[in-house]
């Protein structure tokens, strides 16, 4: 595992309420484990934002943040010689309601602001396109393409990363009655999506937790095949929490993680990010083991 997400702002994982000292200790633990890349999973979600972004404060009904988490993470990444990828703002509404241009415009303005304010950090080395999807969604590729293209243009072609999920048996939609996609359906749909993202997305890192363990290898092989076809690096996103438990979410059983790691190695993954170190793998986690 060479990378981890930084789960601020969180979607469904409880916050640990760390300050600079606690995060410094955790970045040191990451480095000691071999992690060299940290990815801010999103700049904001709905009303909550990770820093006082003027472009979002000016137009969106958001809370003013008490601290600048982006500056803190960048300073720590500088200190521990890590690469930092900046994740986009997820409105939580516009793209779900079909107003894709609003989502795009917000993030294009945010990219300009963020690069001007933080681009001097040596650790600022990439972008993460935060909106997560599992299959063809009308105009979803347009968000990835336009936001990703603009991020690369303003930053001198820094790499972009996406981490979609597989529409498998463990997704909420399928557990609520939707039908899981087969491996062949997954390949067909993502071939269409990725054909529109060639040259815009550099790292493809599918989440690995929404399919059953006996199915995972076949999906990994397809993911690698598609990434190779469209000139992308193929990473895997190891979920280090356990979807099989009745509680959302607790650390994964190490045997399960090892099984997934062996499958990823066999399938030829070129890198591995986890969601995520600080809650589910760190010696500093509130989930003590």
Predicted segments, located by residue:
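Extended, compositionally biased low-complexity polar/Lys-Gly-rich tracts
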Residues: 1-5, 36, 67-83, 184-213
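Substrate-binding cleft of secreted/luminal carbohydrate-active enzymes
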Residues: 26, 35-41, 201, 205-214, ...
């Amino acid at each position: 595992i060479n990378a981890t997400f930084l789960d601020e702002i969180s979607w469904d994982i409880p916050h640990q309420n760390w300050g600079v000292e606690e995060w410094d200790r955790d970045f040191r633990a990451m480095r000691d484990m071999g992690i060299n890349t940290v990815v801010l999973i999103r700049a904001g979600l709905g009303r909550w934002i990770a820093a006082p972004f003027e472009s979002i404060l000016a137009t969106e009904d958001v809370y003013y943040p008490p601290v600048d988490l982006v500056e803190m993470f960048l300073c720590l990444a500088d200190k521990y010689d890590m690469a930092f990828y900046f994740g986009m703002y997820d409105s939580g509404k516009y793209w779900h309601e079909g107003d894709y241009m609003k989502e795009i415009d917000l993030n294009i303005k945010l990219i300009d602001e963020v690069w001007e304010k933080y681009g001097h950090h040596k650790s600022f080395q990439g972008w993460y396109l935060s909106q997560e999807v599992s299959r063809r969604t009308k105009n979803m590729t347009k968000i990835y393409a336009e936001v990703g293209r603009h991020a690369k243009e303003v930053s001198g072609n820094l790499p972009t990363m996406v981490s979609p999920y597989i529409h498998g048996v463990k997704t909420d939609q399928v557990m609520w009655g939707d039908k899981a996609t087969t491996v062949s359906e997954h390949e067909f749909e993502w071939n269409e999506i990725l054909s529109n993202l060639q040259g815009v997305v550099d790292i493809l890192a599918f989440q690995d937790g929404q399919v059953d363990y006996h199915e995972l290898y076949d999906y990994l092989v397809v993911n690698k095949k598609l990434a190779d076809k469209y000139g992308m690096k193929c990473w895997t996103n190891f979920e280090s929490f356990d979807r099989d438990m009745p509680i959302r979410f607790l650390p994964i059983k190490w045997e399960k993680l090892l099984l997934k790691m062996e499958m990823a190695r066999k399938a030829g993954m070129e890198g591995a990010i986890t969601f995520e170190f600080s809650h589910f793998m760190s010696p500093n986690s509130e989930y003590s083991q």
